[in-house]
Amino acid sequence: NRLVLGQVKVDDKSNEITAIPQLLKVLDLKGSTVTIDAMGCQTKIAEMIIDQEADYVLPVKKNQPRLHGDISAIFAQLETDNVIDMPYDTHQTINKGHGRIEIRTCWTIASAHFQDHLRTFTAWKGLNTIAMVRRERRLADKIEVETGYYIASIESDAAQVLDATRSHWGVENKLHWVLDIAFREDESRTRKGNGAQNFATLRHIALNLLSREKTAKCGIKNKRLKAGWDEAYLLKVLSCMG
């Protein structure tokens, strides 16, 4: 729904790894499934999510070399010759449109079957599932294939894991695209002091209000323009703060 629930400034001499725990502390996560970019695949972050009675689905890349190596090796062996005898779940979706076919396939393995093959298993609180997601995009003149690996605290349900990974990228694309198109965020040159964070906060508040206002049958960009020249509509937008 493109709502922004929280925001934390990343210090100039730091990165998102230190900012994410601060953000998790201020959010009510109970009962939710949390997805984060690969930088957020950290044992401390996974522990915080579980401690708040939530679940996680986290991408595993080479910033976690042992974890990435073990998971990729497990799925490679399963794909080639079933050297490791592990039950797994699988789910596939096929979408057609805009001149292409997108096939997404997910395989998941439950912890009871992989924990002896994962050297860092005990470091990840709540870890129940490892997953491999393959995205195949078929265009008129070429085929693109991308493979990603994940750890998850949810049970080994390939459909649920695949849905979580798709939802994550949907939020990324919709939110960032709207902020860029409707608010021209990428063109902002505000750098001094807390200016960048302050303006980002204002953009997020405005986006939340415009997203919640449902009477105007147009996109966020046009809603923003309408609020600028129509005071009656502006009051409708502001009334969504309640």
Spell out what each predicted region is.
Residues 1-36, 41-44, 216-219:
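Conserved, well-structured functional cores that handle cations and Mg-NTP chemistry
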Residues 44-45, 66:
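Phosphate- and divalent-cation-binding pockets in alpha/beta enzyme and binding domains
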Residues 26-28, 48-51, 124, 139-143:
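Solvent-exposed alpha-helices and their adjacent loops that cap or buttress functional pockets
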Residues 155-190:
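Short amphipathic alpha-helical "interface-anchor" segments enriched in bulky aromatics
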Residues 2, 20, 33-41, 56, ...:
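Short, conserved catalytic/metal-binding motifs centered on acidic residues
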Residues 61-166:
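An anionic, glycine-rich sequence signature occurring as long contiguous blocks
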Residues 178-242:
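A short, flexible helix-boundary coil/loop motif
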Residues 46-54, 76:
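Short, surface-exposed basic-aromatic patches at helix termini and helix-loop junctions that form
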